[in-house]
Amino acid sequence: MIKEWATVVSWQNGQALVSCDVKASCSSCASRAGCGSRVLNKLGPQTTHTIVVPCDEPLVPGQKVELGIAEGSLLSSALLVYMSPLVGLFLIASLFQLLFASDVAALCGAILGGIGGFLIARGYSRKFAARAEWQPIILSVALPPGLVRFETSSEDASQ
């Protein structure tokens, strides 16, 4: 299970709208000062993803929840998104090269195959998105932001 913390934006009728920050690098290792990934992360836009997750328990905006998604579904979707355009590119380029015996035809076939593979991946991803095992789930819920209070006694404050 791949896990990530998210912040609740709203909750209505058993559906929680949560926001996840995009992290391209962790910024936690000792070599972060010379890390190329960290530098690239600072250059890009700081974006968030907002998704709807089913949740029977009422949630408060600002509350933290831990989301989880199965590794198998993530690997399958990555395989679909990356491999189908690549396979389409090679297959149609090879077919056009055999049929027309021209590099220009092979180039056109590669472009058409890549676009076709992308469209196939997009169509299948919409079908797979409806499956329950491809949906993120809420694994744990943190306390609401205003529930925890720290008080110090006057004796501790004077010392």
Curated annotation (Swiss-Prot):
Miscellaneous remark of the record: Part of the rseD-rpoE-rseA-rseB-rseC operon.
How does the entry describe its membrane topology?
A: Multi-pass membrane protein
Q: Which organism is it from?
A: Escherichia coli (strain K12)
**Cytoplasmic-side positions:** 1-72, 122-159
Q: What is this protein called?
A: Protein RseC
* Family of the protein in this entry: Belongs to the RseC family.
Segments passing through the bilayer: 73-95, 99-121
Q: Which InterPro entries match?
A: RseC, SigmaE_reg_RseC_MucC
Key words of the record: Cell inner membrane, Cell membrane, Membrane, Transmembrane, Transmembrane helix
Quote the Pfam families the UniProt record gives. Answer: RseC_MucC (PF04246)
Entry keyword Transmembrane: yes
Q: Which domain of life is it from?
A: Bacteria
Q: Where in the cell is it found?
A: Cell inner membrane
Highest lineage ranks of the organism?
Bacteria, Pseudomonadati, Pseudomonadota, Gammaproteobacteria, Enterobacterales
Q: Does the entry feature the keyword Transmembrane, yes or no?
A: yes
| Record topology, Periplasmic segments | 96-98
Show the PANTHER family listed in the entry: PROTEIN RSEC (PTHR35867:SF1)
Question: Which terms does the UniProt entry file under GO BP?
Answer: response to oxidative stress
Q: What happens when the gene is disrupted?
A: According to PubMed:9159522, insertion mutant shows a modest reduction in sigma-E (rpoE) activity. However, PubMed:9159523 shows that deletion of the gene has no effect on sigma-E activity. Deletion of the gene enhances soxS expression. Mutant shows increased motility and biofilm formation. Deletion mutant is more sensitive than wild-type specifically to hydrogen peroxide exposure, but not other stresses.
Q: What is its main location?
A: membrane
Question: Briefly, what is this protein's role?
Answer: May play a role in reduction of the SoxR iron-sulfur cluster. May work together with the RsxABCDGE complex.
GO CC, alphabetical:
oxidoreductase complex; plasma membrane; plasma membrane protein complex
